[in-house]
Amino acid sequence: MRILIVVPQQDHASGNWVTARRFQQGLEKLGHRVIILEITLQGEASFQGKVIDFAPDVALLLHAYRSGKPWLENARDLMIPAVVMLTGTDVNHGLDDPQQSGIIQAVIEQAVCVMLQNPIIANALSRNRPTLATGLKTVPPGVILGHEIFDLRATLGVAQELPLFLMPAGVRPVKGAIGLLKIFDQLAAKGDSFHLAFCGPLLDEDYGRRFRAEIETRPWASYIGVIPPEAMAAAMRSADVIINNSISEGLANSLLEAATLGIPILARNNPGNAALVRHDVNGLLYDDDNSCLRQATRLLKKEYRLQLSRPERSYNPDMEAKTLEAILTEAVNHQPKAQIIASSG
């Protein structure tokens, strides 16, 4: 098959791009021709021409609103069967946003099938919006670890014995970076020794400016910018704990990698994170700021962190690719009704 993957225009270290590249790699390994095209929400005049030049058998849209809206406006009349992957942003925010919900529903209606990256979110969607959730299936997510070298502690100037917390995420309000700094203020006030590092692209200009100003006032915290996806595994191996403080989440690639590597996870308890973090097994979940502080304090102890170091081997990229292949083949054969496909976490 000739497969087109459409992603929103973002930094190439973003989760959408990491997922798109993994899909591309897995599907090409199975013998398919796959290209990735990015598009802005407004669309570009050249986009339709690029699609026509590639002549795909099927399109995979990553992000129902940010990829689906310009697809409807620029490529709908090309009659290419489309598969849509709903993100956490689509489900947790877009469907409740009057400006987005109608467009997301239109994208779902025109799609041959729709994927979700989390079975917990899929079940919630089925309960709350049954008209959007018929014929649920599971697509097991995969992980491909990069092999580039990255010495995180040397970059930060942090001693080997100092507990190092790492939060990999795009810097925008929903990810809660500033809130996490304020929680860790209380840990620092107790006199505990640690370092808190952030990495990821600045995706919101105003929030990013405030975040960097907050970092400057805390000697125990650092922002190191973007770590290339191919080097993220090496960076994580240098950390003691991986943090996710997102208010809402779909299925974070950073947590998939952390779970695969056996790095203990500290994560806000939401459906996206709960699908990956088994509390007191491979990490700790928290419900509020006080709970986060308590769990972070527990993770300062090396002996306890070792108990949570349990590498997860089930995130097989070959299985993910084969399942995607089956879905896309079905789309080419053009099932008349949209089907919701939920990938497991």
What are the language-model segments listed below?
Residues 41, 168, 195-209, 225:
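Glycosyltransferase donor-sugar binding loop
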Residues 14-18, 301-334:
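A charged, aromatic-enriched C-terminal amphipathic alpha-helix characteristic of glycosyltransferases
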Residues 247:
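Aromatic "clamp/platform" in nucleotide-sugar-dependent glycosyltransferases that forms part
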Residues 109-147:
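A short, active-site helix/loop in glycosyltransferases that binds the activated sugar's phosphate group
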Residues 264-267:
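Short hydrophobic beta-strand element within catalytic cores of glycosyltransferases
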